[in-house]
């Protein structure tokens, strides 16, 4: 898409794994790449001022789903209370972090041993993730967002035909939680 928009012919190279692409970028083996937020932060911290974010999918494709939590349909049907408890816990944590990034800064060392060895780096990581709006306060999972994501995958050739939402997703647990805790 970008090559067509900006009329250039890139040399395409397939490198599996965001962390491997980040290392290839840092070592000068490639000039540009798509990497996940964790590796964006790592690259920016390892080489300050040498690399810049060219496109943020969150900005260019609002509503695009990047990640998700998956479970077998049978498990979801048999354990709705467990699924909803997990979703509620995640959303309340997302909201707390979005409202008060210092909360994550103080909690991260409890769960990530060694992370507090470099508090400035941890601060930059927290600020970057919050700045990238990684944690949507409402979960970011809607039929509309899913449709946009599937359409993009079809457009770029990752899917041959659109997958019908109902065949791979269920909104009921998310909607039940949002009904209880409210939407933001």
Labelled PLM ranges:
Residues 65, 72, 137, 161-164:
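Glycine-rich, flexible loop/turn motifs
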Residues 147-184:
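Conserved C-terminal helix/tail region of periplasmic/extracytoplasmic solute-binding proteins
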Residues 78-160:
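Secondary-structure end/capping motifs
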Residues 1-14, 44-48:
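Ligand-binding cleft/hinge of the Venus flytrap
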Residues 13, 31-32, 141:
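Residues that cap or flank secondary-structure elements
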Residues 19-114:
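Pocket-lining segment of extracytoplasmic ligand-binding domains
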Residues 16-17, 133:
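Glycine-centered small-residue hotspots that permit tight backbone geometry or close packing
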Residues 1-3, 23, 41-42, 151:
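Surface-exposed charge patches
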């Amino acid at each position: 898409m970008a090559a067509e928009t900006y009329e250039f012919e890139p040399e395409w190279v397939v490198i599996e794994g965001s962390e491997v692409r980040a290392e290839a970028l840092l070592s000068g083996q490639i000039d540009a790449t798509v990497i996940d937020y964790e590796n964006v932060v790592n690259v920016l911290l390892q080489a300050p001022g040498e690399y810049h974010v060219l496109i943020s999918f969150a900005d260019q494709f609002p509503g695009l789903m990047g990640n998700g939590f998956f479970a077998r349909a049978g498990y979801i049907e048999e354990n709705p209370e467990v699924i909803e408890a997990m979703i509620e816990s995640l959303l309340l944590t997302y909201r707390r972090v979005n409202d008060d990034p210092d909360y994550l800064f103080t909690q991260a060392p409890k769960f990530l041993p060694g992370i507090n060895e470099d508090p400035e780096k941890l601060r930059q990581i927290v600020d970057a993730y919050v700045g990238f709006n990684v944690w949507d306060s409402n979960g970011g999972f809607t039929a509309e967002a899913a449709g946009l994501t599937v359409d993009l995958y079809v457009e770029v050739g990752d899917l041959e035909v659109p997958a019908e939402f109902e065949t791979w997703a269920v909104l009921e647990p998310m909607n039940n939680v949002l009904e209880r805790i409210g939407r933001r």
